[in-house]
Amino acid sequence: MAGPQRRGSGAGGGERRDRKGRDGGASAAEKTAYVERVVAINRVAKVVKGGRRFSFTALVVVGDGDGTVGVGYGKAKEVPAAIAKGVEEAKKNFFKVPRIQGTIPHPITGEKAAGVVLLKPASPGTGVIAGGPVRAVLECAGVHDILSKSLGSSNAINIVHATVAALQGLQRPEEIAARRGLPLEDVAPAALLRARAGAGA
């Protein structure tokens, strides 16, 4: 009698392990739905009565690689916890980036604090011509062809926020045409017109 009971208990444990494994797999799939880039990790200190208390900060960029991106800043006593907080904040700061065939609709300059970043559209096949912090934001946003140049501070935090400011300032050709009272053909890039013509054909 004891033998069958042990086998039954083992089977039940196996089922529980299987269920746990399936649940864990689902959560892992959800986590990999976004592209995450850790741009900078710094150790900071707070002076208290007993001495100095150290913690870590993490600047994280998260996006879906298809026009949605956000930036977050996390702080914790351990690096993994700081990164996790940064990821959660980045998801709360998601915004949409207008794109045309993998690039941006028009040139734009973004400024934040001492950071200044210039972004220019590029033809297909150019790739992402950008430094580390700018590249992280653009790749997470799903921009594949672009030219960029940092004109201000070399601080990674300022550069990332200047890049975000530039992307948030982008306007769709339809919005520009409506504001100016002009036909779309007068303001839209040639790439957009070719893409629409091809889709119509």
Swiss-Prot record:
Keyword field contains Oxidoreductase: no
GO cellular component: small ribosomal subunit
RNA-binding recorded as keyword: yes
Gene Ontology BP annotations: translation
MF (Gene Ontology): rRNA binding; structural constituent of ribosome
Segments of this protein annotated with the region Disordered: 1-28
Top-rank lineage group of the source organism: Bacteria
Entries under InterPro entries matching the protein: Ribosomal_Su5_D2-typ_SF (IPR020568), Ribosomal_uS5 (IPR000851), Ribosomal_uS5_bac-type (IPR005712), Ribosomal_uS5_C (IPR005324), Ribosomal_uS5_N (IPR013810), Ribosomal_uS5_N_CS (IPR018192), Ribsml_uS5_D2-typ_fold_subgr (IPR014721)
Location of the S5 DRBM domain: 34-97
Ranges annotated as biased composition (Basic and acidic residues): 14-23
Keywords: Ribonucleoprotein, Ribosomal protein, RNA-binding, rRNA-binding
PROSITE patterns according to UniProt: RIBOSOMAL_S5, S5_DSRBD
Domain commentary: The N-terminal domain interacts with the head of the 30S subunit; the C-terminal domain interacts with the body and contacts protein S4. The interaction surface between S4 and S5 is involved in control of translational fidelity.
Similarity comment text for this entry: Belongs to the universal ribosomal protein uS5 family.
Assembly description: Part of the 30S ribosomal subunit. Contacts proteins S4 and S8.
Stated role: With S4 and S12 plays an important role in translational accuracy.
Protein name (Swiss-Prot/TrEMBL): Small ribosomal subunit protein uS5
Organism in which the protein naturally occurs: Streptomyces griseus subsp. griseus (strain JCM 4626 / CBS 651.72 / NBRC 13350 / KCC S-0626 / ISP 5235)
GN (gene name): rpsE
